[in-house]
From Swiss-Prot:
GO terms for molecular function: electron transfer activity; FMN binding; oxidoreductase activity, acting on NAD(P)H as acceptor; oxidoreductase activity, acting on NAD(P)H, quinone or similar compound as acceptor. It holds the Pfam family Flavodoxin_2. The gene is azoR2. It comes from Bacillus licheniformis (strain ATCC 14580 / DSM 13 / JCM 2505 / CCUG 7422 / NBRC 12200 / NCIMB 9375 / NCTC 10341 / NRRL NRS-1264 / Gibson 46). Belongs to the azoreductase type 1 family. The keyword Heme does not apply. Its cofactor is FMN. The lineage of its organism: Bacteria, Bacillati, Bacillota, Bacilli, Bacillales. Its EC number is 1.6.5.-, 1.7.1.17. The keyword NAD applies. This is FMN-dependent NADH:quinone oxidoreductase 2.
């Protein structure tokens, strides 16, 4: 059974967010076209996504020194254990769908925290004499991103770092197929906002059938 992780990083739902509206249209279409697939929704604003902090570094250090997991403090066990759960879940996925807004040229901080959780040497990539090699070579990924302005071309394209970051991480993990669905210009041209939204929903539904 194909397992798809639907990973959203937005505090709003589809009623207030263009990216979430497109994401909802995509995943509903995807489920209809792939009824036997397992879809797991990770709402990063509601999930427990530990940041890499002093407890995590301390816990990792103890484990690397030979201590057993039960010898960690309660805080260390909770955070290190949860990070392991997230990385194992990510590895078990076959397809990844990331849904984010473009905020200050990137995505919400919780998205970065999630990538920190799943970027684990020996799991999603490994180090070799020739450099790091991605281990997720049989996966595919999609990024749905809403941008109030226009960032697909021109000088503004150089400022966009959200999609570029996810693209870099997918390459780093060895994911061979990665594409983006962008909704842009609704703030720059508010009179066209509804048209932009509906066009994005149509494209999302089409992509959901073939992804």
């Amino acid at each position: 059974m194909t397992k798809t992780l639907y990973i959203t990083a937005h505090p709003h739902d589809e009623r207030a967010s263009y990216s979430m509206a497109a994401g909802k249209a995509f995943i509903e279409s995807y489920k209809e076209a792939h009824p036997d697939d397992e879809v797991i929704h990770l709402d990063l604003y509601r999930e427990n996504i530990p940041q890499i902090d002093a407890d995590v570094f301390s816990g990792w250090g103890k484990l690397q020194s030979g201590s057993g997991f039960e010898q960690l403090s309660e805080h260390e066990k909770a955070k290190v254990g949860r990070l392991n759960e997230l990385s194992e879940q990510f590895i078990a996925g076959d397809k990844y769908v990331f849904v984010t807004p473009l905020w200050n040229f990137s995505f919400p901080p919780v998205m970065k925290a999630y990538f920190d959780a799943v970027a684990v040497a020996g799991k999603t990539f490994k180090y070799t004499e020739q450099g790091p090699i991605g281990l997720l070579t049989d996966k595919k990924a999609l990024h749905i991103q809403a941008r109030g302005g226009y960032y697909s071309e021109g000088q503004a394209a150089e400022l966009e770092m959200g999609h570029r970051y996810i693209s870099i991480m997918m390459q780093f993990f060895g994911v061979p197929e990665f594409e983006g669905l962008f909704i842009e210009g609704h703030n720059a041209e508010p009179d066209k906002a509804e048209e932009i939204k509906q066009n994005a929903i149509v494209r999302a539904k089409e992509l959901g059938r073939t992804f």
